[in-house]
Amino acid sequence: MRLKIAKESLLNVLSHVVGAVERRHTLNILSNVKIQTNAQALTITGSDLEVELVASTALSEGACLEAGETTVPARKLMEICKSLPTAALIDLQITEDQRCILKSGNSRFVLGTLPAEDYPLLTTENSQGTQVQVTQRELKRLFEKTAFAMAVQDVRFYLTG
């Protein structure tokens, strides 16, 4: 797997899913995010076995030099992306010995990976979503009627509203 992507694009997608990744993990792979690439898009998945977040971004023509999938440490990847200059172009490559090499300018980082096949997925590929249409006024009214029940401080971030 190999792709070239702007720092801001990768950071934007990564920041959407890193919240679901466990800091203290029971399984090593749960501290990773799953990265999938093809000619059209980059998809990143993060999970803690209760919540799964998936975010995608379109890739420009020629950005994906080799399609593939792997998992990399989420927080380390996030910190590396944050430390790079704003207009940086990141060359992300998975080697044959399953190492993730990130290059940008004079910087070079090597991260360990785990097989993408071992990553736990909560959704199924053929699941069909349900769509509901609600007016803005009705949705606001529903939020106002239930807001009092939201937890203010809870380790399970999805319960805090």
Give short role names for the model-derived ranges.
Residues 1-161:
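Structural preference for solvent-exposed beta-strand-turn elements
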